[in-house]
């Protein structure tokens, strides 16, 4: 009987998520039979999300791509035929070689995002460097605006160990919905609330995390920076600040103090459309508990004013001295883990063109650049779902001579490909994972062989590299020996066998972030006034508030036709666009609309509605709810056009943040009408 019992292996989820959960995986007869949280993990302590529970459905589901495919018919129609790996690689080799000779290596756009975290995906650069160059993108879809803003202000992006939230007396969630996007931090929030902590929620809607909130504030979309400056004004005016901390550990306070005088409560209330008594209430809560934890989410930094907004919000923690102490602090992400080094990198070629911002991928590719983009290699990404203005992106991609996509599924992006290469799942290759919700480094173990003819990208590049005659020493096999070399090259004080059993935490890790009160800024202090903001980004060194684009004040002509602000947030059953096609997790696409807005348009609950603007349109099911204010419609991001016939990025514009080259998805006006 013992021989038939499944073996239990430990691994880590590599998805682009705060969790980076440690997993216990049962494997029997070469197949995964069950996935659960590792009960001995210091982070998730046995907890995993609904997506993690459904990993076997992803690995073995009928949607999985198993063989190389070649397009037949027109691009985008999703019609393919099965071909061999030799045929696929030969077609790719000949076309890439021809394009390199005719236009130069920069004619190939290599596009890679963060479907999986980890270090071994750097094998791609070992190939493209030997190719002689390529075109790449810069900026981000997710958090680049906030990361840059916090680095400019504090010198590092880090926060206390999440369990320290249980010591908090006051917790403020600002544009954050951890019940859906960070269940481990939510666990500790709930424990703090059960012990008597007050919970305040600031969001454009009533989210799933705020069910126990003592106070809800719903600002007009994009006005969070104004609200933060108004709160700062009141904290200073009412002396709810830590003068000693400010004097010793901050720079530019006097200039900041003058700035916030321009944000009296009446003006802030009018701008944010938050009733004055509610703003006064949050001041009173902070007065009662000036040492508080402020958890800032991704949502506030998806506007064109994102960087200055995050700077303003983060500085509220500095005003009351809520930095470097237990039970308080500013939480965005925790980047204390040391960088993992890829020791197999060939010399970097000169002909790398880093010229296209991710936020403007479509128009950036469409611009008259020399040489023009003629081919696109896409892995770990689904831009036809995840990037803005996908109708334009589709038109641009249709002009390309070659599109290669490596993926597990027939995504909207894969449907655009000439050649699809079937990729390995996280259980089918080795990797080292660092996350951003905690600072542990964990070994991702290989537990099963890839099904069909699926391969990890390292093997794809190795096979293609052979055809080009590249040095394969720079394209190592995915093996324990490769992982050991990465560990040694990264100066980690651990061994492979040890990593199989437990996560690694670097000795420099701070359980209480900034507990030493050292800040890696030019002034060695927290910077209210940051000269680098002006030098790098050409923006005001102080975190001033500017109205974002595409709203009723900055775009009255657009607003007159499309008067509803569309906000898209992340769901509990999808990871960006991943898991959208898994049958058990599928849902009918919907949109929240306030009953007042619905009534004026003759829309009833559950009816089909057309959501549209000048960029595109789609049909969703209307859900009438008071959880969104009039003038706002809300839904969750990640539906595929090929599966759900509903891709929200048909509607979004190519807007970029003030700082950090972030993508401003939330600057999006739409109109809604009943489908007859």
Place the predicted regions along the sequence by residue.
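Acidic/polar loop patches that form or flank catalytic/metal-binding clefts of enzymes
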Residues: 33, 136, 242-243, 279, ...
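Long, contiguous, secondary-structure-rich segments that constitute the structural scaffold
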Residues: 451, 456-502, 577-591, 596-676
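N-terminal leader/propeptide and maturation segments of large enzyme subunits in energy/redox metabolism
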Residues: 71-82, 240-276, 447-527, 585, ...
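N-terminal export/assembly segments and adjacent metallocofactor-ligating motifs
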Residues: 1-238, 267, 275, 369, ...
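Extended redox/cofactor-interaction regions of prokaryotic respiratory oxidoreductases
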Residues: 122-190, 195-202, 209, 225-229, ...
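Short beta-alpha connecting loops at secondary-structure transitions
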Residues: 211-219, 439-450, 584
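Active-site phosphate/pyrophosphate-binding segments
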Residues: 231, 250-361
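Phosphate/diphosphate-binding loops
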Residues: 12, 18, 392, 398-402, ...
